[in-house]
Amino acid sequence: MAAPLRHTLLKLVPTLLRSSYVAQVPLQTLCTRGPPEEDAPSSLPVSPYESEPWKYLDSEEYHNRYGSRPVWADYRRNHKGGVPPQRTRKTCIRNNKVAGNPCPICRDHKLHVDFRNVKLLEQFVCAHTGIIFHAPYTGVCMKQHKKLTQAIQKARECGLLSYYVPQVEPRDADFGTVHGAVSVTPPAPTLLSGEPWYPWYSWQQPPERELSRLRRLYQGNLLEESGPPPESMPEMPTTPPAESSIEQPGSQSA
């Protein structure tokens, strides 16, 4: 009697465990949803030089931190392997959160890229060639590099940032008339001799055999034979219309 009872209890144990497992509620349903990220306060500090960013580069705090070196001089990129990627990260700040090892501009919240901040822009332009340094060389992210490029171009257009214009001395050979394409084109030899430019422009005597064939063909309609054209057309006397009108009444009166 004890054996069948124990066997029945062993059959009921998996059923009870299965029912308790189905009744379990996941922990995610019990968690409350946090406030949206838009309503969350920004963790970034507020910069006092946002309206006038050029004053920060003249402050004592800037000189104590960077000295006379550029802001990207002591920056080292953090990447995997020994060969750095050819492009830097897209941006260092996402959803008001700063990534690890931010770029030289994103790590200092008092640095602002502005076309009026000439001292900051000069640090990203080569002093000898005027070429803007590439992003992998300075280490700035691609978002800040795009802002730097636009600010440098606008500063050059406004005359705030000087740039190099190469001076090229013109060569005398470029303005000479020695070249054949620049000199006067000589006339054709046929024009100097008085002959026409094309041979079919002058009179060509047709062969006698062809003339005899045409005479037989057009024997009933041929009135007279045409010879070669005259060398020059006869010149007609040209008189002004006023003189001719004056002479006519005079001749009638005479």
Curated annotation (Swiss-Prot):
One of its GO terms (biological process) is mitochondrial translation. Gene3D superfamilies: Ribosomal protein S18. The keyword Cytoplasm does not apply. Residues 227-240 have a biased composition (Pro residues). It is found in: Mitochondrion. Keywords: Mitochondrion, Phosphoprotein, Ribonucleoprotein, Ribosomal protein, Transit peptide. GO terms for cellular component: cell junction; mitochondrial inner membrane; mitochondrial small ribosomal subunit; mitochondrion; nucleoplasm. The modification Phosphoserine is found at residue 47. One of its GO terms (molecular function) is structural constituent of ribosome. The keyword Ribosomal protein applies. Residues 1-33 form a transit peptide. Residues 218-254 are annotated as: Disordered. Belongs to the bacterial ribosomal protein bS18 family. Mitochondrion-specific ribosomal protein mS40 subfamily. Component of the mitochondrial ribosome small subunit (28S) which comprises a 12S rRNA and about 30 distinct proteins. PANTHER family: MITOCHONDRIAL RIBOSOMAL PROTEIN S18B, SMALL RIBOSOMAL SUBUNIT PROTEIN MS40. This is Small ribosomal subunit protein mS40. The lineage of its organism: Eukaryota, Metazoa, Chordata, Craniata, Vertebrata.
